[in-house]
Amino acid sequence: MTYELLNTIDAPAELRRLDRRQLGTLADELRAFVLESVAQTGGHLSSNLGTVELTIALHYVFNTPDDRIVWDVGHQSYPHKILTGRREQMATLRQLDGISGFPRRSESPYDTFGTAHSSTSISAALGMALGAKTQGENRVAIAVIGDGAMSAGMAFEAMNNAGVYRNLPLVVVLNDNDMSISPPVGALNRYLARLMSGQFYAATKKGVEKLLSVAPPVLEFAKRFEEHAKGMLVPATMFEEFGFNYIGPIDGHDLESLVPTLQNIRQRALEGGRPQFLHVVTKKGQGYKLAEADPILYHGPGKFNPQEGIKPAARPAKVSYTQVFGQWLCDMAAADKRLVGITPAMREGSGMVEFEQRFPDRYYDVGIAEQHAVTFAGGLACEGLKPVVAIYSTFLQRGYDQLIHDVALQNLPVVFALDRAGLVGADGATHAGAYDMAYLRCIPNMMVMAPADENECRQLLSTAFAQDCPTAVRYPRGAGTGVVVQPTLEPLPVGKAEVRRASTAPAGQRVVILAFGSMVAPAAAAAERLDATVVNMRFVKPLDAACVLEMARTHDYVVTVEEGCVMGGAGSACLEALAAAGVATPVLQLGLPDRFVDHGDHAALLALCGLDANGILASIRERFAVQPRAVQPRVA
């Protein structure tokens, strides 16, 4: 497809010079460009296809970047990036040194607030609106939030706060596509679906049908109205009760409706009064039939042929850690009826699809509500159940107070299965699990484990489940090392490390590498070239202090390596043990640097951080006076 109109748009000011009748053509080109770009790079697709018209309308009506648009989560920001001067850079999307898959303030003045975790947009936009008002600046702040993100408490906290203000230039746009990543759950979504069934709606429905029947151009929207009219005719909706002026729902793909509605809303926002709330109905995957039919599959695909669609992948040689967790969860649930599984809206990503199918009465999807998920698990544990919370490492940060106060303080036996621990590749710093070892090991009663491979992941999950205290097992994204996963559910000894390789180096050259989790494999590769001892530490807490002390006393140099932040992490735990015992063996700590590591290929990022085998070896040689052993010649 040629992009004759799109190629003329490098900034929203150029978009605003178009005749409104040209916007439909632009939408077609923009949607095709999004599809073509994501097919070549991978990335988020169905959410972006669903926001093409909304994005065009927002930039057409509002004076961006002076008017501030905040995209909640940011999965849907690709059309925005394309219209704001980054069309050519889409070829670098989510790649090392390329543009981010999420809004970033450092990337463009049109990215007014960095997002990636959900439900933050209304809070940020409220701050911007009040900031503008305080400084006497005449501009509008717009939060664009999906119906899935609206289920989180933070969104309601912001709305509750915003509703008390008057003469506030704030607009909230609810992008209602009936999806988050997994289908949305909870009372809010049922409420939105139930509004159209009230008595007022029933009494007027026939009259509305007669009106629509004589207006053929809107018959298609009439069908959408029948499906999605969640409050159009119901007075005093929940959003009005929060103090907003509610408009909608309107068709989020109908530019003829979107543009004048947004123009009216902008005018009202600038004139003062209550904050404005626009409810638009969109369809994830709009315009690409395969994504419309399966928006979850096309939520975040890798590279694919858009003519053929995503093909079923060949069975990989190595299972992923997520798959190992999912299988363990089902096996343990079959063995112990006390097990219940909890996810904050990440059923597919956390590997819980089979568990939900086999044990629907023991599966709880609480929506995008990490704080609630943690305390909810604590409540289940109080009644003698054994909750397993499947959550990404980065998202557990959102439930930290609940983890301390509601679970650990009461020493409740909740298992936290932390997926995406360490660097996560293309999703970048916002999704990296860089801090869990540091923020978990300082909590009393908490046990923290880091498996070296997929078989050990299963073993440590069983170990965690067997405890009468809160536990966490952290494991990385993607495929394991290729070891055979044994079907056993037997736990490992608590707090015991494993020596994987013993050094034969002479005195003065003896190095021990204390490796945690995913770093055992590259540490072992480096150790072969250095003739170093390698210890698979397994437990961040309780640390095998006896092993650490023995290794420090029998080696000349100690190296700790972890795929997590150095400050306060697992290496710090080793240093604390050595300091407490008065052991002064030189120590080198390796881990993630004191900066946010950007997006890119996972292997490239590890190399950039010096956490591949070459980097580990180079750091050891630079710090200590040791030499790699001579490579033995091959025997023919």
Swiss-Prot record:
Q: Name one GO cellular component term.
A: cytosol
Q: In which pathway does it act?
A: Metabolic intermediate biosynthesis; 1-deoxy-D-xylulose 5-phosphate biosynthesis; 1-deoxy-D-xylulose 5-phosphate from D-glyceraldehyde 3-phosphate and pyruvate: step 1/1
Q: Source gene?
A: dxs
State which Enzyme Commission number(s) the record gives.
2.2.1.7
Disulfide bridges in this chain: none
- Gene3D superfamilies per the UniProt record, alphabetical: 3.40.50.920, 3.40.50.970
Keyword annotations for this protein, in alphabetical order, are: Isoprene biosynthesis, Magnesium, Metal-binding, Thiamine biosynthesis, Thiamine pyrophosphate, Transferase
Species source reads Ralstonia nicotianae (strain ATCC BAA-1114 / GMI1000)
Name of this chain's protein: 1-deoxy-D-xylulose-5-phosphate synthase
Single GO MF descriptor:
magnesium ion binding
Co-factor remark = Binds 1 Mg(2+) ion per subunit.
Which reactions are catalysed by this chain?
D-glyceraldehyde 3-phosphate + pyruvate + H(+) = 1-deoxy-D-xylulose 5-phosphate + CO2
Its quaternary structure? Homodimer.
Read off the InterPro entries from this record: Dxylulose-5-P_synthase, THDP-binding, Transketo_C/PFOR_II, Transketolase-like_Pyr-bd, Transketolase_BS, Transketolase_C, Transketolase_CS
Pfam annotation, one family: DXP_synthase_N
Task: Please give the PANTHER family that the UniProt record associates with this protein.
Answer: 1-D-DEOXYXYLULOSE 5-PHOSPHATE SYNTHASE-RELATED, 1-DEOXY-D-XYLULOSE-5-PHOSPHATE SYNTHASE, CHLOROPLASTIC
The domain of life for this entry's organism is Bacteria
Q: Which cofactor does it need?
A: Mg(2+); thiamine diphosphate
Q: Which residues bind thiamine diphosphate?
A: H75, A116, H117, S118, G148, A149, N177, Y288, E370
Q: Which family does it belong to?
A: Belongs to the transketolase family. DXPS subfamily.
